[in-house]
């Protein structure tokens, strides 16, 4: 059974980070310039400001997502996942993520949601389309190691 909760525990973050796919670990390393560390990734995202949620399958966390405020009305997403989120629950994870994004707009908390991904994550880029993200720009040299990143956004043009 798939369930969503808006109050993920630190333990949920740790469990997801333990199982995190290699490409997500490499992205975190590229962004931070530090070797991937389960505790660091879990605690860093757990303590980030903004709304967070956890998706559980049979009471085990498979994905944690959230939005970190950048400025009023603008939020940057994050997602920590397990392989099972993609192999067994892709549709549910996508549907829930899209609904959470919609709620950010409907509540008027956001007029812009954005996502930044390492340039090599083509598989992830394909997932962003059903979420409503549009590829916006290449951020040259954005990563700590000098690699490029890609900026995606979803904008509510009716905001005001």
Where are these regions (language model features)?
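A short beta-loop-alpha structural element at the N-terminal edge
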Residues: 1-27
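Conserved beta-hairpin
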Residues: 49-65
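Conserved beta-strand-loop-alpha-helix junction that forms the acyl-donor binding cleft
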Residues: 110-129, 142-143
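Conserved catalytic-core motifs of GNAT/GCN5-like acyltransferases
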Residues: 116, 134-149
